[in-house]
From Swiss-Prot:
<comment type="function">
    <text>Transaminase; part of the gene clusters that mediate the biosynthesis of AM-toxins, host-selective toxins (HSTs) causing Alternaria blotch on apple, a worldwide distributed disease. AM-toxins are cyclic depsipeptides containing the 3 residues 2-hydroxy-isovaleric acid (2-HIV), dehydroalanine, L-alanine which are common for all 3 AM-toxins I to III. The fourth precursor is L-alpha-amino-methoxyphenyl-valeric acid (L-Amv) for AM-toxin I, L-alpha-amino-phenyl-valeric acid (L-Apv) for AM-toxin II, and L-alpha-amino-hydroxyphenyl-valeric acid (L-Ahv) for AM-toxin III.</text>
</comment>
<feature type="binding site">
    <location>
        <position position="92"/>
    </location>
    <ligand>
        <name>pyridoxal 5'-phosphate</name>
    </ligand>
</feature>
<dbReference type="InterPro" id="IPR001544">
    <property type="entry name" value="Aminotrans_IV"/>
</dbReference>
<dbReference type="Pfam" id="PF01063">
    <property type="entry name" value="Aminotran_4"/>
</dbReference>
<dbReference type="InterPro" id="IPR043131">
    <property type="entry name" value="BCAT-like_N"/>
</dbReference>
<keyword id="KW-0663">Pyridoxal phosphate</keyword>
<dbReference type="InterPro" id="IPR043132">
    <property type="entry name" value="BCAT-like_C"/>
</dbReference>
<feature type="binding site">
    <location>
        <position position="232"/>
    </location>
    <ligand>
        <name>pyridoxal 5'-phosphate</name>
    </ligand>
</feature>
<keyword id="KW-0843">Virulence</keyword>
<keyword id="KW-0808">Transferase</keyword>
<dbReference type="InterPro" id="IPR005786">
    <property type="entry name" value="B_amino_transII"/>
</dbReference>
<feature type="modified residue" description="N6-(pyridoxal phosphate)lysine">
    <location>
        <position position="196"/>
    </location>
</feature>
<protein>
    <recommendedName>
        <fullName>Transaminase AMT5-2</fullName>
        <ecNumber>2.6.1.-</ecNumber>
    </recommendedName>
</protein>
<dbReference type="GO" id="GO:0009081">
    <property type="term" value="P:branched-chain amino acid metabolic process"/>
</dbReference>
<keyword id="KW-0032">Aminotransferase</keyword>
<comment type="similarity">
    <text>Belongs to the class-IV pyridoxal-phosphate-dependent aminotransferase family.</text>
</comment>
<dbReference type="InterPro" id="IPR036038">
    <property type="entry name" value="Aminotransferase-like"/>
</dbReference>
Length: 373
């Protein structure tokens, strides 16, 4: 069994001060296949080539039969590497698979693949002192059979890719401006909104680009049935905080058409530990004017403050004047607690983190054949 010197220290070949959210070359990824002959997912393979060889008529490419996840690994003060609530990602991955006829990846295999992907790329986990940076983990699964017919696929592929990243956006200090999307709905009332499938994201890219050109860093979706209730941002969840007479209340939209965000759930638990009231319920757009602070929340965005929310059709602009830099702000308290738990400088009272296992203790297959380009 090979020894990998796990965990390796952060690579000196990476400029850790200049990370973005764009991929850089790492050692490889984990890949598993599902075939009808055995009717189960096969053993993990470590593949050094980031490219996949996929038939052009694969249902994933033609009909969108694919799912994905987003999670992170962090380096702690002692040098160990931690995952944050990975079992919740495994559960959500299976939930997404159920929407698009992909065989669910068993939780044990999902976690094993994630541990291997991180462990075999441990030198790409950012150093502990690069606060906010992490090793981003992207599990994907897709139908890889060759068929032109809209029919059940029989071959599937499951992969786990990794890359070191900085926060996607911090909106530090003043926060980001958000635009309410009015020309396209994110998800139908009985659609796939609660699943991480590409079809929930690709249709909004053009709108996001236009919004960015107009100075908006976020796009916010209302419910598709009435366009009166808050759902979520295009790529992150929504959280609002209201302070009345010294009493702090966190408000979180609750709808079957939004993604069950692991970061949002964590923020709710942290808020409750502060003694704040947490309300998961339907949130009307008009209620946003009553909030003291608002955030975009997710694995990539972490916790990003919102400065203003604009809705063109009603000529409404709701502004938030909170000093997000203040140590007393809800934003600062929530963010520092979450990052402290993730990176090991605060006690993990909830048992959310999981130390990455040494890949030397696992038996997996290393593929040396590269994909065709």
């Amino acid at each position: 069994m090979a020894s990998y010197g796990f965990p390796l220290t952060a690579s000196s070949l990476v400029d850790w001060t200049s990370l973005t959210f764009s991929p850089i070359e790492v050692n490889g990824h984990i890949q598993c296949t599902y075939s009808p002959e055995v009717a189960e997912w096969g053993a993990p393979h470590f593949v050094k080539d980031p490219y996949l060889r996929v038939h052009g008529l694969a249902p994933a490419l033609n009909y969108g039969q694919q799912i994905f996840e987003g999670m992170k690994a962090f380096r702690t003060p002692t040098g160990s590497i931690r995952l944050f609530r990975p079992k919740m990602n495994a559960v959500r991955f299976a939930h997404s698979a159920s929407f698009v006829a992909i065989p669910p990846v068993p939780e044990a295999l999902f976690l094993r693949a994630v541990h291997l992907a991180v462990g075999l790329n441990s030198e790409f986990v950012p150093p502990y002192d690069s606060r906010g940076s992490a090793l981003y983990i992207r599990p994907i699964a897709f139908a890889s059979s060759a068929t032109a017919n809209l029919a059940p696929a029989d071959h599937f592929t499951f992969c786990v890719f990794v890359m070191p990243v900085a926060p996607l956006s911090t909106g530090a200090g003043q926060g980001l401006r958000a635009l309410v999307v009015e020309d396209v709905d994110r998800a139908a009332p009985k659609g796939t909104g609660s699943a991480k499938v590409g079809g929930n994201y690709a249709p909004i890219v053009t709108t996001m680009q236009r919004a960015k050109a107009d100075g908006y860093g976020l796009t916010l979706h209302l419910d598709s049935a009435t366009h009166t209730m808050v759902d979520e941002f295009s790529a992150s969840g929504f959280i609002g905080v209201r302070v009345d007479a010294g009493k702090t209340t966190m408000v979180v939209p609750d709808s079957p058409t939004i993604l069950r965000s692991i970061t949002v759930d964590s923020m709710c638990r942290i808020a409750e530990s502060f003694g704040w009231q947490v309300q998961r319920r339907a949130v009307s757009f008009t209620e946003l004017a009553e909030l003291s602070e608002a955030f975009a929340v997710g694995t990539a965005f972490i916790l990003t403050p919102v400065r203003a929310i604009t809705r063109p059709c009603t000529h409404t602009c709701i502004e938030y004047t909170a000093d997000y830099r203040s140590s007393a702000s809800a934003y600062t308290r929530l963010l520092e607690t979450l990052q402290g738990i993730q990176q090991g400088w605060l006690d993990d009272a909830w048992g959310w983190t999981e130390e990455v296992q040494d890949p030397s203790s696992d038996e997996f297959i290393t593929d040396t054949v590269q994909a065709r380009r």
